[in-house]
Amino acid sequence: MENKSISVIGAGSWGTALSIHLAKIGYKVNLWVYEKFLCEQIKRTKENSIFLPGFSLPKLIYPTNSLEEAIGGNDVILIVVPTNFIRNILDTLAPFLNPSSVIINAGKGIETDSLCTIREIFKQTLPPTCCFATLSGPTFATEVARGEPSAIVVASEADSISHRIQSIFSN
């Protein structure tokens, strides 16, 4: 049986929209918010007024400013931060990850300093037992937050991981 709890690391418009979607289909979402003031505001108002204004966050979304708290023992972690911050975030998260964690990248781009792709960054920083996948597609945060029909692709080196992630996001 699937654990109905997921960590979303990054509360920009895309991370917030994915959190809303996951909460609407029954997942408890630990949403890591980098900005402490924004985290407190989201807790108070149940809205991310800076990155995704006008959308009420479901009760199943639990904002936190602590990466350790955001992981909270979850084995599915969605990374939704700008590429140039991914390496630092993963280094910080590593001690809190379960050996069988599934790390899903929902960003795009390359690391400016090293010219590494996100996949390369994940391979260099994560324990070898962690599985890695990418979520991508022609979607917009506001459309996903509104619950409009969307198509998104998940890719992983392991078909079983791709299918697992697909079942999580499908509704």
Can you say where each PLM-predicted feature lies in the sequence?
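Exposed alpha-helical structural elements
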Residues: 37-38, 160, 164
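Short beta-strand-to-turn element immediately C-terminal to the catalytic PLP-Schiff-base lysine
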Residues: 153-157
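NAD(P)+-binding Rossmann beta1-loop-alpha1 motif at the extreme N-terminus of oxidoreductases
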Residues: 1-55, 62-65, 92
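Short, intrinsically disordered, charge-balanced linker/junction segments flanking boundaries
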Residues: 167-171
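A residue-level signal for beta-strand positions that form part of recognition/binding surfaces
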Residues: 60-61, 151
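Rossmann-like NAD(P)(H) cofactor-binding subdomain of soluble oxidoreductases
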Residues: 57, 67-72, 76-149, 162-166
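Short acidic-hydrophobic sequence patches enriched in Asp/Glu that either
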Residues: 30, 34, 114, 161
